């Protein structure tokens, strides 16, 4: 892209929806998505570790209160949904919820803020700066998260039920007759594969659409501000809701994996 060219609305949107990447095709690495997701993960770990080390039984500070509210909320969600015995589920759910919430929250960052900051610091032409700061608007990130959940589902299904029990679950339901076992296997396999697929696409679709609408609003010009703030206010619901849905479905799927029929 020519650094001095004036962008049309379509070029402006396309530019902001393009990742900073190395490589091409399947082997392309999106450096911005990867960098922001790692950074926000470290922010989560640093804050929660710091609060845990400084926790007091006396009057807690505001940050400790906020962390305790989040931990209590996630713990209650796990207790009401997960009926197996696994000490990993609660911390896993907490990590998923807070990490995705932080990544989603990057959607509130004004679309031109980071490119202009990079331009101001480095002097790079704006047309050469690619920075997509919302990791969950990148399907590579959401599919990576969903793949991790899928691996845990398979692992605990085999660990709790054994290989034989897991295969029996795939072949003997919903139809009980032996002649329909192949049909059962196909149906159950499709159902199992649909779980991570739906997790990834739901999160990606909602955040990508949100980012796209912010960009469309930005093309209006100076008249964008009232609409921009209205959409940002609506995102106060969407951003935590998508993190909550991903967490709850993960808990449900892992609970099903722990059920030994």
From Swiss-Prot:
Primary role: Key component of the proton channel; it plays a direct role in the translocation of protons across the membrane.
Keywords associated with the record: ATP synthesis, Cell inner membrane, Cell membrane, CF(0), Hydrogen ion transport, Ion transport, Membrane, Transmembrane, Transmembrane helix, Transport
Oligomeric form and interacting partners: F-type ATPases have 2 components, CF(1) - the catalytic core - and CF(0) - the membrane proton channel. CF(1) has five subunits: alpha(3), beta(3), gamma(1), delta(1), epsilon(1). CF(0) has three main subunits: a(1), b(2) and c(9-12). The alpha and beta chains form an alternating ring which encloses part of the gamma chain. CF(1) is attached to CF(0) by a central stalk formed by the gamma and epsilon chains, while a peripheral stalk is formed by the delta and b chains.
NCBIfam families for this protein: ATP_synt_6_or_A, PRK05815.1-1
Transmembrane segments: 28-48, 89-109, 140-160, 203-223, 229-249
Molecular function GO terms recorded: proton-transporting ATP synthase activity, rotational mechanism
Segment forming the signal sequence: none
Subcellular localization(s) per the UniProt record: Cell inner membrane
Family membership: Belongs to the ATPase A chain family.
Protein name: ATP synthase subunit a
Gene3D superfamilies the UniProt entry points to: ATP synthase, F0 complex, subunit A
Organism: Colwellia psychrerythraea (strain 34H / ATCC BAA-681) (Vibrio psychroerythus)
Chief place of localization: membrane
Membrane topology designation: Multi-pass membrane protein
SUPFAM superfamilies: F1F0 ATP synthase subunit A (SSF81336)
Biological process annotations from GO: proton motive force-driven plasma membrane ATP synthesis
GO cellular component: plasma membrane; proton-transporting ATP synthase complex
